[in-house]
Each structure stands twice: as structure tokens, then as C-alpha cells.
Amino acid sequence: MQITSFHPPRRTLMGPGPSDVSDRVLEAMSRPTLGHLDPAFVGMMDEVKSLLQYTFQTQNELTFAVSAPGSAGMECCFANLIEPGDRVIVCQNGVFGGRMRENVERCGGIAVMVEDAWGSAVDPDKLQDALKAHPDAVLVAFVHAETSTGAQSDAKTLVQLAHQYDCLTIVDTVTSLAGTPLYVDEWGIDAIYSGSQKCLSAPPGLSPVSFNQRAADKISARTTKVQSWFLDLNLVMGYWGGEGKRAYHHTAPVNSLYGLHESLVMVQDCLLYTSPSPRDRFL
């Protein structure tokens, strides 16, 4: 049997992701491939960073797209912020809270679980009880909008609670970014990750992430190496940092980043965050 070119049928995608990709994004991805250190491509990377800062509503310098799907963005956050022996409170109300636990334990951390029924939001009172019971906890992790059930939790309140007990936060926004109000700086989120294939309507394969200065300081103060060479932010940001000469780290998925760039331009053009009532644009 001779295999010929694959021509996928047109579908209207109604699952939890991937979502439909616009012709604008598909066209952008078909443009000529550049070298991953080409000045034109590096300039586009800077634009992706700026557009992600807008979409996350943050000024975090440490904002970029991991060259892998959302699960790698999750692992990037946990691998960089957790050292062996760290106690981490994980809120689980669906499948992806369970994956957070897996990441904590694979990093050598100790996971303290706060369980809520699938389909319900994370209960802030339960989180507060766990924080009181474990004063040595250093991190709180939760899913903003649980893909497996559609339940959305009150991220602002959960982050505020964590900070009251001097914990950093890791927040999964794979489903919620660009689909529901999300204010990284205003809410004080320390580390956040998402995916390109949900509300951003770009193809799968990239994971937007952002880390504030508190998170960056914890990473800088590590006494052990990050488990993953590929996801070690101390190395990755030599490529994405945007200051001076770029250091080669890996070959970026050039055409996929063209697509993400175009989808983020479309988010910007929608004026999601425009006064006087930006939240109304999500309704």
C-alpha cells in the first residue's frame, strides 16, 4: 500500500480541546520557516511575550511559551518551584488536580490534598483549614477552571488565602485563559500555566507560562538542580529573556509560534481588557 498525503476532514470541534483554529492562524503557520535565532524570528518572540503579558494581564518579565503542550507548562512550574521535602497543598476537584499531585511527588515534594467533589469549586474554607494544619507548607496549587468538569474556582480568594500563610501559588489556567476574567498581577498569582489549544484557539503544542518576582526569587534560591534540563528556567530564559544576545537552548517550534502569535493578536483585537467594564466582554 502506498501512503499518500493526509487531508483531514473539516470538523466543528465541540470537545474540551483542541478547539477550532481560525483560517488566520492556519495561514500564519504556513508562512516560511525561519531559523530559531533569526533576528526577525527573535523579534516576533518578543511580540509573543508582550501579547502573553496582555492576555495574562501581567507585567511579569518571566512570561513566555513553553515549547510543548500544557502538561509541560504544568511540569515547568512544579519542577522549578519544588525541591525535595517541600510541603505543597494541592486542591483537587477533578482530573488535573490529581496530576498536580503527581508532579509534586515526582519532584520529591510532600503533597497535602484538599479534596472537593468533582463538579464543585475548590472550597476556600477547606484550603484555610489545610494551611492552618500545615504551617510548613511553601506552595498552594489549584486549577482555576477544571477541564474535566467545567467547574471554575475563585482564584483571587484562593491566592489571597495562600499569601496570608506565606505560600506561593501555582495556578492551572489551561481552560480559562482568554475564556473568563483572569488578572495575574491584580490577583497576585505567583506561577501560572495554560495551553494554546483551548480558548486561545491555536493548535496544540505550546504552553504559555508566567512567573512573578517572588517565584523567580524562589527559583534563584534553589539548593538543588531543577529535575528537567529542558524545563530549567535558568537555562530557558537565556533564549526567551529578550535582553542582549540570545543563548541557544533548543530549536523552538517556529511555525507553531507563528500561529500562537496570530491567535494572541486576535485576542488583543477583541479588546478583552478595555475600560470601563472589561469583565463584561466575557459575558
Residue ranges: model-predicted function:
Residues 28-76, 95, 99-105:
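Conserved N-terminal alpha-helix of the aminotransferase class I/II PLP-enzyme fold
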Residues 273-283:
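Single conserved hydrophobic/aromatic residue that forms the stacking wall/gate
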